[in-house]
């Protein structure tokens, strides 16, 4: 929901939009972004929200920018992990936020991801529309279980709740090859015996709600 004609007429002050970017149309407002049809209706809805919600102070739309830094269209693309500049430390992104139609709209606070080292997460899509970064982490693989020492896969990810039970959610889906001992799909970790938590969540879809939560606290302290 963009906050226009919501069920029951109930609107929110803050909308977290945790989905990334698409490539159907680089410019204008046609095409599709994820499962959301983009057109004048979307632009009008966002504009209405920022002009009318919160008693005229405006709704706040917090949007994840995507995880496409390393997403190449072919194996020969000189970007991300495939970039010949990796060794010199000048890695080029495979895309930027402005190539997504929805990220060309001015009505959102767009959020990139950073990790525990307080630098950009390896996957986070860069671009001129990024306002701020939130915590997205890396991939949470254990170097004791996998040969990932010193790579992006070893960096800690985000700890969060999961679907209950060891056959459900992220833990259940990866039970055959859990990233670390906490994600043991047999319930073998004493602090996660019911598999209700996962320690390998990541992405700008994690970063955006972390920022949305901070924004909520700011509005609680200063609603005007």
Question: Language model features by range: what are they?
Answer:
Residues 1-105, 117, 191-210, 221:
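Substrate-binding/access-modulating region of protease and related hydrolase catalytic domains
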Residues 91-216:
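Extracellular S/T/G-rich loop segment that most often corresponds to the catalytic His/Ser-adjacent loop
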Residues 218-224:
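Phosphate-handling active-site elements
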């Amino acid at each position: 929901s963009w906050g226009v004609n919501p069920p029951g007429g109930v609107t929110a002050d803050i909308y977290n939009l945790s989905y990334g970017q698409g490539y159907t149309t680089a410019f204008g407002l046609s095409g599709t972004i994820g499962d959301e049809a983009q057109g004048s209706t979307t632009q009008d809805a966002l504009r209405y929200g920022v002009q009318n919600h919160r008693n005229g102070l405006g709704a706040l739309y917090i949007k994840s920018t995507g995880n496409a830094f390393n997403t190449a269209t072919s194996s020969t693309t000189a970007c991300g992990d495939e970039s010949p500049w990796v060794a010199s430390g000048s890695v080029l992104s495979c895309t930027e936020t402005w190539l997504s139609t929805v990220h060309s709209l001015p009505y959102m606070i767009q959020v990139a991801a950073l990790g525990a080292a307080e630098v950009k997460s390896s996957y986070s899509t860069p671009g001129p529309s990024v306002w701020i970064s939130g915590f997205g982490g890396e991939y949470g693989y254990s170097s004791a279980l996998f040969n990932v020492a010193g790579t992006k896969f070893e960096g800690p990810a985000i700890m969060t709740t999961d679907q209950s039970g060891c056959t459900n959610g992220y833990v259940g889906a990866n039970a055959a090859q859990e990233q670390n001992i906490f994600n043991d799909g047999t319930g073998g970790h004493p602090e996660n015996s019911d598999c209700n938590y996962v320690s390998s969540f990541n992405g700008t879809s994690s970063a955006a709600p972390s920022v949305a939560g901070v924004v909520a606290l700011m509005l609680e302290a200063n609603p005007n």
